[in-house]
A protein has these predicted regions:
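Membrane-spanning alpha-helical segments of multipass transporters and channels
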Residues: 1-192
């Protein structure tokens, strides 16, 4: 789901160009208006992933509805996070999303138990969204344990707030810097 969100920000423009029909659109309106596209495509991706896991791969799942719900929540969080990074930092945000993905794949406990990973991963893995998404999905597959599933989804909700802060607040001071970087890239005739 993270890779799908990353591909979305790579192939769909996040910048909303001025429109004659809506000249007074506020930055937050542009942010949410464009994000709807990312959200809908991400939800289709989550549905296809969940249905593929359940009916094509035929995983054993104690609660298919909660499995889909966890996929949908992960997709929402991941697409919003990627979108916010890209809105705030443009190409640097995309690169940052790739770096975060690599760190999470290596050290979020999905490949190997976190206890056998290097100490640095043991210290930082809980600051990333992957472990909470994986734990929520694991709960629906292996059986529910108390409120762990809902706790994981709640923690993923914190990343929604972080994403909104990045995309709506932190993006403001970076607009001029992003314009300078974009202008510099255009002058170089090398980069897209």
């Amino acid at each position: 789901l993270w890779v799908g969100a990353l591909i979305l920000v790579a192939i769909i423009h996040v910048k909303v160009l001025p429109d004659e029909k809506i000249p007074d659109a506020k930055p937050y309106q542009k942010f949410f208006g464009r994000y709807i596209t990312f959200f809908l495509i991400g939800q289709v991706q989550a549905l296809i992933t969940a249905l593929g896991d359940l009916f094509y791969i035929k995983i054993q799942c104690h609660n298919p509805f909660l499995f889909w719900l966890a996929c949908a929540c992960c997709s929402f969080v991941f697409t919003l996070f990627m979108y916010a990074l890209t809105v705030a930092f443009e190409n640097v945000g995309e690169a940052l999303a790739v770096v975060i993905m690599v760190i999470q794949v290596a050290g979020a406990g999905g490949s190997f138990p976190i206890e056998v990973l290097p100490a640095i991963y043991q210290r930082i893995y809980r600051f990333f969204p992957f472990p909470y998404g994986m734990d929520a999905l694991r709960e629906t597959i292996g059986g529910m344990y108390g409120m762990t599933y809902w706790k994981c989804l709640g923690i993923l909700g914190i990343y929604i707030i972080i994403s909104l802060l990045i995309g709506l607040v932190i993006a403001i001071p970076f607009r001029k810097l992003n314009m300078k970087i974009e202008h510099s890239k255009e002058k170089s005739d090398i980069m897209l």
